[in-house]
């Protein structure tokens, strides 16, 4: 199973800029991939667990193991390619 976790914060401008890209990628994969949003202020322990140091950070996991990490806003193609490589 592929999981894509977006670590964000309500005060983060780049996080807001990433939202439409993340939503488009989510729509492309539907139920084949699990997408989640994690607010680092509300779920600080998750941010610590994944060693998130800046936002936005997107982590792609396959079978519970991290396979790719993106820090900052990337292109829709970058996220899509990473997911496709791990399906």
Language-model region placement:
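Conserved redox-active cysteine motifs that mediate thiol-disulfide chemistry
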Residues: 7-21
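Thiol-based oxidoreductase modules, predominantly thioredoxin-like and allied folds used
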Residues: 7, 22, 26, 30-44
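Extreme N-terminal starter segment of soluble prokaryotic enzymes
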Residues: 1-3
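Structural micro-motif
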Residues: 50-59
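CheY-like receiver
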Residues: 46-50, 82
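Non-catalytic, surface beta->alpha helical segment in thiol-disulfide oxidoreductase systems
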Residues: 60-87
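Short loop/turn elements that flank and shape the SAM/SAH-binding pocket of Class I
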Residues: 43-46, 77
């Amino acid at each position: 199973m592929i999981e894509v976790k977006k670590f964000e914060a309500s005060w983060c401008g780049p996080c807001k800029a990433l939202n439409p890209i993340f939503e488009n990628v989510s729509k492309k994969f539907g139920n084949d991939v699990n997408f989640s949003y994690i607010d680092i202020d509300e779920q600080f322990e998750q941010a610590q667990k994944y060693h998130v140091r800046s936002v936005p950070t997107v982590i792609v996991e396959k079978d519970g193991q991290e396979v790719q990490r993106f820090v900052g806003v990337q292109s829709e193609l970058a996220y899509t390619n990473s997911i496709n490589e791990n399906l």
